[in-house]
Amino acid sequence: MSSESKTKTFLEFQFAMLLISGNILFAKLIDESVWMITFGRTVFASVGLYLFLKWRDKPVFFTTKTDNIASLGAGVLLAVHWITFFASARLASPAVAVLTLFTHPVITVFLEPIHFASRPKKTDLFLALLVLLGVGILIPELKPGNDLFLGILSGLFSAFTFSYRNLVAKKFLSHHGSAQVMFLQSLTAAILLAPVCYWDPIPTNYRSLGLMILLGTFFTAFAHTLYMKSMFQLKLKTAGILSSIQPVYSILLAWILLGDIPGYREIIGGVLILFAGTLETIRYKKEVP
């Protein structure tokens, strides 16, 4: 990969991270259940990506059984990831949800060698632990059994499913277009979550519907497609550590848009996460393909 291509991939990845960071704001902005928010975003993401693929005259389904099964599995993982992510935000706080989710670089560093012919380098382990330390500083004192503790557990499970979804997509689906990959994952998640309509009424007010459309099309379909496109060009551990910037983006967005002022924990933890991300960025640009 040329230096120009690396820079383009890096910028696309960071823009995707900025957009995905905005997802957590919708947990506060949309007055609906976690299940309905997740179902709504998957439906509108699927519709948006389907129309895009048809407009570009691209296929919407894969031709091989293996790819379709992999896409189904990735879609299930994505649905669980989104549900547990928003549940973490509701149980604890948006900040805790984002920060526990971004233990996923640590998880990725240890999962990737299991499925790919590679071994984690000492630098990878150091950066992963640095990210974990940064996240640990950001999280206040725990008391098992309370909402904060349950929110953190939910966030950690969300991190695991996110890491495994990325691994499945990278290993089995990276030879396909990112929009097609994301469409099938979103469609699978939407079908899986459809039963929520039996116990949770579909919102009828324009505000909730409008925010769900925005979340599903721009902050999910577009953002995650761009993320997948960039991720396919990177090593999973590199993508994981570079994405550690997302908690910082989320804290800044919450500060600017919701008035949530970061405390000293957020500042110190954010600096450590930024430091790890900066080191990985320098390594990424120096790597020889």
Regions found by a protein language model. Give the residues of each.
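Transmembrane alpha-helices of multi-pass small-molecule transport proteins
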Residues: 9, 32-80, 105-111, 161-165, ...
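Hydrophobic/aromatic residues within transmembrane alpha-helices
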Residues: 30, 37, 41, 88, ...
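Specific alpha-helical transmembrane segments that line the substrate/conduction pathway
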Residues: 36, 43-44, 86-119, 158, ...
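Glycine-/small-residue-enriched transmembrane alpha-helix faces in small-molecule transporters
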Residues: 1-40, 47, 73-76, 84, ...
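Juxtamembrane helix-entry segments on the extracytoplasmic side of multipass membrane proteins
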Residues: 6-9, 31-39, 62-68, 140-161, ...
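Helix-helix packing/entry segments at the starts of transmembrane helices
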Residues: 97-103, 169-189, 220-256
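Hydrophobic transmembrane alpha-helices of multi-pass small-molecule transport proteins
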Residues: 49, 53, 72, 78, ...
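Specific transmembrane alpha-helical segments of multi-pass solute transporters/efflux pumps
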Residues: 50, 56-95, 101, 137, ...
